[in-house]
Regions:
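Surface-exposed coil loops of outer-membrane beta-barrel proteins
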Residues: 40, 108-181, 196-198
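Surface-exposed strand-loop-strand hairpins of Gram-negative outer-membrane beta-barrel proteins
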Residues: 34-55, 83-86
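Transmembrane beta-strands of outer-membrane beta-barrel pores
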Residues: 31-39, 64, 74-80, 104, ...
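Conserved small/polar residues in nucleotide/adenosyl-binding loops
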Residues: 241-248
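Residues that define the transmembrane beta-barrel architecture of outer-membrane proteins
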Residues: 48-56, 90-96, 136-142, 170-176, ...
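Transmembrane beta-strand segments of Gram-negative outer membrane beta-barrel proteins
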Residues: 22-39, 70, 109, 232
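Residues on the lipid-exposed face of transmembrane beta-strands in outer-membrane beta-barrel proteins
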Residues: 56-62, 98-102, 142-146, 178-182, ...
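Repeated loop/turn-to-beta-strand initiation elements of outer-membrane beta-barrel proteins
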Residues: 25, 66-72, 106-110, 150-158, ...
């Protein structure tokens, strides 16, 4: 069934169920642009280029019992300067947002395909570069976090992002990420960020790679005419590689 038919049936089901329980209609949209002029000699890590794009994301959904939401949206991306021919798509990329969200005073949980901005954690660019965060802006899986209402900026979260399905054409890929922070008195705090990227094989190549990153840190936020945040931490990285895992 096409995405268009799925969305039409979903909206019809929401409209039909409006009389069954108290519901609030949610309508919104986000618009972002990104300009990144990368002028340098090409190397093994990246290439010299200019990234210039715009993204528009309209959303619609329903809320019931003040804690439950079901959201449908479309992520529309256009790379400036990309000329689409007669047989090419109108936009550079079009992808869905479909997720359920539970939201209470302390706890939030998302399941489905949702925006990366739902994350609370402080993940350095060693985890996600700024371009990765923009162009890979959706998570497909689950997110859960707990946020303290008694201590400011105190939370813990975990998410699973499923990025690839096991098949002959693609590898099985998923990423488990987690972060936490605890704020002490007078602005002192400590926390961590964690990522495990599982890059498994396809049906034609059974090699498996696991990339682990752990970043514990501590810091001090204070005000002296301006807001300051002094932070120090460590980054631990571990790469695990298994060849022909299916035969072992």
């Amino acid at each position: 069934m096409s995405l268009k038919k799925v969305l039409m049936l979903s909206f019809a089901a929401l409209a039909a169920g409006g009389s069954l329980s108290a519901q609030n209609l949610i309508v919104g949209a986000d618009f972002t642009t990104r300009f990144d002029n990368r002028e340098y000699a090409n190397n093994d890590f990246n290439e010299s280029q200019t990234l210039f794009s715009a993204r528009f994301t309209p959303r619609i959904g329903v809320e019931w019992m003040e804690k439950n939401r079901l959201i449908f949206g479309v992520d529309l991306l256009q790379n400036f300067g990309q000329h689409n021919g007669a047989r090419e798509p109108f936009l550079s990329d079009v992808k869905p947002l479909i997720y359920y969200q539970f939201n209470s005073k302390n706890v939030q949980a998302n399941a489905g395909i949702f925006d990366r901005k739902e994350l609370l954690g402080d993940y350095s660019r060693a985890f996600f570069s700024d371009s990765t965060a923009f162009y890979h802006n959706r998570l497909s899986g689950f997110l859960g976090h707990y946020k303290s209402t008694e201590r400011e900026n105190t939370y813990v979260e975990m998410a699973i992002d499923w990025e690839g399905m096991y098949s002959e054409q693609s590898r099985e890929m998923f990423r488990i990420i987690s972060a936490g922070r605890y704020t002490l008195e007078r602005g002192f705090y400590f926390g961590y960020a964690f990522s495990m990227f599982h890059f498994a094989g396809s049906k034609l190549n059974e090699n498996v790679t696991d990339n682990l990153l752990v970043n514990p840190y501590a810091g001090w936020g204070f005000n002296a005419f301006f807001d300051f945040d002094i932070k120090a931490g460590f980054l631990f990285a571990c790469l695990l590689y298994t060849s022909d895992a299916a035969d072992e």
